[in-house]
Amino acid sequence: RFKKIRRLGALPGLTNKRPRSGSDLKNQLRSGKRSQYRIRLEEKQKLRFHYGLTERQLLKYVHIAGKAKGSTGQVLLQLLEMRLDNILFRLGMASTIPGARQLVNHRHILVNGRIVDIPSYRCKPRDIITTKDKQRSKALIQNSIASSPHEELPNHLTIDLFQYKGLVNQIIDSKWIGLKINELLVVEYYSRQT
């Protein structure tokens, strides 16, 4: 993980750690001139590692985004941001996306009153995300909310801290995406691969 954040910069979904500023300067001096391919590859890897996807999963999302109406890059980011594991992370119910994925896999999370154990579940507007009524589930979420830094919540999400309940208001707007990334380079990377 630390090699990844040193190479690609801060990835808030992967870990809470930040790269040191001095090490970044050394990497730039050592690496020399960066080719266009390398720039596109690094943007793709940044997206992959932030959301914790395999190459095949990301390729599937790129194909879905390509078939949808609108800008492929924007649609791709919307698809990734509306995943259940990412929404739990953005609500503060998990400190990282892998932590959110574990909560979902261990069946601690309910969507609209039903247990969902698929981290890639695509949330829709007006979905209500809650925890199971079990004490252990509530304790896990409570610890995560207490330990996570209280950043500004994106406008497409609402959280009730007392009932441990989150609400998806709408599909995310591109300015609220939690990662600094040039999504066009990712789309370009995949368009050149085929």
From Swiss-Prot:
CDD domains: S4. InterPro entries: Ribosomal_uS4, Ribosomal_uS4_bac-type, Ribosomal_uS4_CS, Ribosomal_uS4_N, S4_RNA-bd, S4_RNA-bd_sf. Keywords: Chloroplast, Plastid, Ribonucleoprotein, Ribosomal protein, RNA-binding, rRNA-binding. It comes from the Eukaryota. Signal peptide: none annotated. SMART domains: Ribosomal_S4 (SM01390), S4 (SM00363). One of its GO terms (cellular component) is small ribosomal subunit. It is found in: Plastid, Chloroplast. GO terms for molecular function: rRNA binding; structural constituent of ribosome. Residues 82-143 form the S4 RNA-binding domain. Belongs to the universal ribosomal protein uS4 family. Part of the 30S ribosomal subunit. Contacts protein S5. The interaction surface between S4 and S5 is involved in control of translational fidelity. One of the primary rRNA binding proteins, it binds directly to 16S rRNA where it nucleates assembly of the body of the 30S subunit. With S5 and S12 plays an important role in translational accuracy. This is Small ribosomal subunit protein uS4c. The gene is rps4.
